[in-house]
Curated annotation (Swiss-Prot):
Organism of this sequence: Bacillus thuringiensis subsp. konkukian (strain 97-27)
Disulphide bridges: none
Record's keyword terms, sorted: Magnesium, Metal-binding, Thiamine biosynthesis, Transferase
Residues that coordinate or bind 2-[(2R,5Z)-2-carboxy-4-methylthiazol-5(2H)-ylidene]ethyl phosphate: T143, S144, T145, G175, I195, S196
UniProt name for this protein: Thiamine-phosphate synthase
Length: 219
């Protein structure tokens, strides 16, 4: 197996759905299935925060979600937990700046997908040098899902990354909705990552379809 190509990674980032059990009011397995039917291109398991599952329950839940992703041939990424990603043989892992260092993550993950959240050009360059396949840049807009986020960057922050010669695939993160997706893509992102825009939608399927349309219209 060799590392994923830039072009392939860029395509996978189009509509990036992130979810844990506590992000849904409906059955999360059903929400994921609807999102996959609607056309998400990659999924990240993020079980964090108030009411999140722990221990064996968390692992079992992750396995259920992973099995559904496999049915649809969509990559399953684990947030912040390299050991779990390895245990599940996940397609990749996504880490933040405060998590395990990117060099050790790349070493452990081999050729699997490694994504890194970045807020500055320095962080971006460091992540690229040490093996990131893509960057998560944000928060672009205010978000209520993550309580520990950095200052909102707006689309200008994202455009700045491209102006500074960052060519690696980028997914926009934070407060992204159907209404503002086009702005994120136009600023230079390859795709959008969302939680509540799908997880709390009246119809996860319809909401995903609209996001997919917005992204392809704006690219």
């Amino acid at each position: 197996m060799s590392r994923i190509s830039k072009a392939e990674m860029s395509k996978l980032l189009s509509v990036y759905f992130i979810m844990g059990s506590n992000n849904c009011t409906k059955d999360p397995l059903q929400v994921l299935r609807e999102a996959l039917e609607g056309g998400i291109t990659i999924f990240q398991f993020r079980e964090k925060g108030e009411g999140a599952l722990t221990g064996e329950e968390r692992i079992c839940f992750a396995k259920e979600l992973q099995a559904i992703c496999k049915e649809y041939g969509v990559p399953f990424i684990v947030n912040d937990d390299v050991e779990l990603a390895l245990e599940l043989d996940a397609d990749g892992v996504h880490v933040g700046q405060d998590d395990e260092g990117i060099t050790s993550v790349r070493e452990k993950m081999g050729d699997k997908i490694v994504g890194v959240s970045t807020h500055t050009i320095e962080e971006a360059r460091w992540a690229i040098e040490n093996g990131a396949d893509y960057l998560g840049v944000g928060p672009i807009f205010p978000t209520s899902t993550k309580k520990d986020t950095k200052a909102v960057q707006g689309t200008k922050g994202l455009a700045h990354f491209r102006e500074q010669g960052i060519t690696i695939p980028i997914v926009g993160i934070g407060g992204i909705s159907i209404e503002n997706t086009a702005l994120v893509i136009e600023a230079g992102a390859d795709g959008v990552s969302v939680i509540s825009a799908i997880s709390l939608a009246e119809s996860a399927y319809e909401s995903t379809k609209k996001l997919v349309e917005e992204v392809s219209r704006s690219l």
